[in-house]
C-alpha cells in the first residue's frame, strides 16, 4: 500500500525566525547579538520593500493592459516603469535593491549584493539615509552557504501571508529581544513597547491629525499604532506629521526602517542623539506626544543642563533618575493651548520624595490630567507594573474630536487596571498578559466620559477601578499620585458570613478526620494480616 504524502508544513513566522536565529548562532563571524539582529532586520526590510515593489509593478502592468498597452514593450517600460511613483509608500527600487535580484544571486556573491542594495537605497531616497550600517554583510564575511540559508528562510516571509497591517519588523525585533535579550536592557534603549499598550495610549489621547512627537521613539511603534488608529477611522495618515528622536543608534535605524516600510514620512533627525543634551526639535511644539522612555534612567544629567529652560517654574530633576526630566521635556514640547501627552513611567515616579516639589508644581498648574496604573507582566523585559501619565494643556473644556469637554482644572482622574490580568499570552517562556480590544475601549471610555460635559467629577468613581479626585485631597496626601491612596478598596472580608463559613470548615475537618481514622484502621488490619500487629 502506498504511503500517504506528509502534509505540507504550514509556514509560521515564529518557526521561520527560529530557523534564522539558529542559522545565525551557528554561523561563523556572525558577530554580537546586536550585529545578528541588524543583519536579520535588514534582510526582513529588504524582503518587504521588495515584495511591495513587485506588487506595485504588477498593479501597474494590469493598469497598462486595461488601457491596451503592452507592459513588455521596451518603450512602454521606459515611459512608465523607470520613474513610477507609488502612492502607498512603495519604493521604486533600483535593480540592485530588488528582492528578485538578491534571491537569485549565487551564494558566493550574496554579501556584496546585499551591501550594494543598501548603498543604492540610501542614494535613491533621503528618508532612508542613516538606516543601515555600511558594510553590514561584507565586514562580517559570513560563509556563502550560511548567508544563503538565512536569505532563503527570509524569502518565506510574505506580507500577504502574515498580514499587511501587522508591524512585522516590530515582531521580528520583539522575537530577537526575547531570544537574545541577555544584553538587552531598557536603559540601553533595547526595548519594544507591546502593541496593546501603544493602542491604549493612542485610544485615550486620539492622535488623529497634526504633529505627533516621541522623544524616545524606539522602533517607532507609537507612530505605527497612531497611523493604524487613523486608518481604522477612515482618516488620512498624511495628516499626521511624525517627529521623533532616539538615542540608541541601532534602534534609531530600526525606527527609520519600520516607518519606511509603512510609507510614513517622518522627521527623526539626521542621526541618533539624546533628547536631553541635544534636543533635535528644540523650540517646536506638538499637538500630541506619545512615549515610553527608559525607566529610572541614570547618567542622563550634564552640568550644562542645570539652568535649562525646560525646568523653569517646576524645578531641577534629580541627576540620579531621569523620570521627571522626561516629564518636563515632554511638557516643554506640548502646544501651550491644547497639547496632550500620554507616556509611561515606572510607578516610583508617582510618589518619590525627591521629586515632590516638581510634582506639586505640575499638579497645581493643572498639567496632570490622568494617572493609569497598568497590570504587571505586560512587557517583555520586565514584569513590574508601570503607569500611564496623561498631561493636558487644556483642562478648561471646549470641543475635542467632536466631544464637548467640561472644565477639569481642579481634578485628576485615577485609574487602577492592575486586576486586568485575565488575558494571558500563550506560548511565552515567562508569564505575560495583554490588554484586549474590549479592555482598551473600556479604559478609553472611562477617561473620555470623565472629560465630557454632563459628568459630575465630584461623584465619578467605581471602587477598585477609578475615581476623580480634587486638588484639596491630593494636597492632603502630600501631592502623591499613587492611585491606591484615592480609589476605594472594598474589604471583601466584610461580606463573609463567618458563622456559616466556620460551620463549613468544621464539616470539612470532620470528613478529613473520619477518612484518616478509616485509613489508620485499614493499615492496622493489613499489618495484622501478615502477623505483625500494631499496638
Region locations from a protein language model:
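Non-catalytic, mostly N-terminal accessory regions of nucleic-acid modification and defense proteins
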Residues: 1-208, 267, 271-280, 373-376, ...
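Short, contiguous acidic/charged loop-to-helix segments that flank catalytic cores in large enzymes
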Residues: 30, 300-321, 346-353, 375-381, ...
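Conserved S-adenosyl-L-methionine
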Residues: 187-291, 296-300, 305-313, 325, ...
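Active-site catalytic pocket residues across diverse enzymes, especially alpha/beta-hydrolases
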Residues: 53, 230-234, 334
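C-terminal, active-site-flanking charged/polar segments
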Residues: 66, 367-368, 378-443
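Short helix-terminating capping/connector loops at secondary-structure junctions
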Residues: 234-239, 337-338, 407-408
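Conserved Class I SAM-dependent methyltransferase catalytic core
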Residues: 19, 32-48, 252, 270, ...
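Hydrophobic alpha-helical scaffolding
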Residues: 140, 162, 216, 244-248, ...
Amino acid at each position: 500500500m502506498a504511503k500517504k504524502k506528509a502534509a505540507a508544513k504550514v509556514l509560521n513566522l515564529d518557526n521561520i525566525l527560529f530557523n534564522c536565529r539558529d542559522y545565525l548562532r551557528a554561523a561563523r563571524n556572525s558577530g554580537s547579538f546586536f550585529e545578528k539582529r541588524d543583519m536579520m532586520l535588514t534582510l526582513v526590510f529588504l524582503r518587504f520593500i521588495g515584495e511591495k515593489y513587485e506588487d506595485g509593478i504588477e498593479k501597474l502592468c494590469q493598469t497598462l493592459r486595461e488601457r491596451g498597452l503592452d507592459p513588455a514593450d521596451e518603450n512602454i517600460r521606459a515611459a512608465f516603469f523607470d520613474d513610477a511613483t507609488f502612492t502607498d509608500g512603495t519604493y521604486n527600487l533600483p535593480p540592485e535593491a530588488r528582492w528578485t535580484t538578491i534571491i537569485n544571486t549565487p551564494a558566493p556573491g550574496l554579501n556584496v549584493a546585499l551591501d550594494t542594495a543598501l548603498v543604492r537605497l540610501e542614494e535613491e531616497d533621503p528618508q532612508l539615509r542613516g538606516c543601515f550600517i555600511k558594510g553590514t554583510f561584507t565586514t562580517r564575511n559570513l560563509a556563502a552557504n550560511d548567508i544563503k540559508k538565512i536569505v532563503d528562510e527570509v524569502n518565506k516571509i510574505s506580507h500577504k501571508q502574515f498580514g499587511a497591517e501587522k508591524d512585522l519588523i516590530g515582531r521580528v525585533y520583539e522575537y530577537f529581544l526575547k531570544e537574545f535579550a541577555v544584553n538587552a536592557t531598557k536603559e540601553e534603549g533595547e526595548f519594544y513597547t507591546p502593541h496593546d499598550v501603544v493602542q491604549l495610549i493612542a485610544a485615550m489621547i486620539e492622535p488623529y491629525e497634526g504633529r505627533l512627537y516621541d522623544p524616545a521613539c524606539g522602533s517607532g511603534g507609537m507612530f505605527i499604532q497612531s497611523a493604524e488608529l487613523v486608518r481604522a477611522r477612515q482618516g488620512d495618515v498624511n495628516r499626521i506629521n511624525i517627529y521623533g528622536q532616539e538615542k540608541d543608534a541601532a534602534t534609531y535605524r530600526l525606527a527609520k526602517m519600520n516607518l519606511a516600510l509603512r510609507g510614513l514620512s517622518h522627521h527623526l533627525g539626521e542621526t541618533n542623539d539624546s533628547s536631553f543634551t541635544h534636543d533635535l526639535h528644540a523650540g517646536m511644539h506638538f499637538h500630541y506626544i506619545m512615549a515610553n522612555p527608559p525607566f529610572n534612567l541614570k547618567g542622563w544629567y550634564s552640568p550644562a543642563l542645570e539652568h535649562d529652560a525646560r525646568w523653569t517654574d517646576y524645578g531641577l530633576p534629580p541627576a540620579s533618575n531621569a523620570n521627571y526630566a522626561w516629564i518636563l521635556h515632554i511638557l516643554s514640547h506640548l502646544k501651550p493651548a491644547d497639547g496632550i501627552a500620554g507616556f509611561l513611567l515606572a510607578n516610583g515616579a508617582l510618589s518619590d520624595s525627591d521629586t515632590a516639589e516638581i510634582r506639586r508644581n505640575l499638579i497645581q498648574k493643572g498639567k496632570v490630567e490622568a494617572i493609569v496604573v497598568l497590570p504587571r507582566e505586560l512587557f517583555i523585559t520586565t514584569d513590574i507594573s508601570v503607569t500611564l501619565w496623561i498631561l493636558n494643556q487644556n483642562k478648561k473644556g471646549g470641543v475635542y474630536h467632536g466631544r464637548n469637554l467640561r472644565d477639569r482644572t481642579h481634578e485628576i482622574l485615577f485609574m487602577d487596571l492592575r486586576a486586568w490580568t485575565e488575558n494571558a499570552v500563550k506560548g511565552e517562556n515567562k508569564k505575560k498578559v495583554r490588554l484586549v480590544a474590549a479592555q482598551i475601549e473600556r479604559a478609553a471610555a472611562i477617561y473620555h466620559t470623565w472629560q465630557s460635559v454632563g459628568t459630575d467629577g465630584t461623584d465619578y468613581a467605581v471602587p477598585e477601578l477609578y475615581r476623580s479626585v480634587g486638588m484639596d485631597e491630593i494636597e492632603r496626601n502630600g501631592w502623591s499620585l499613587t492611585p491606591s491612596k484615592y480609589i476605594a478598596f472594598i474589604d471583601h472580608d466584610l461580606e463573609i458570613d463567618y458563622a456559616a463559613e466556620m460551620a463549613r470548615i468544621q464539616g470539612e475537618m470532620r470528613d478529613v478526620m473520619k477518612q484518616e481514622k478509616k485509613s489508620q484502621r485499614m493499615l492496622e488490619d493489613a499489618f495484622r494480616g501478615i502477623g505483625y500487629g500494631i499496638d
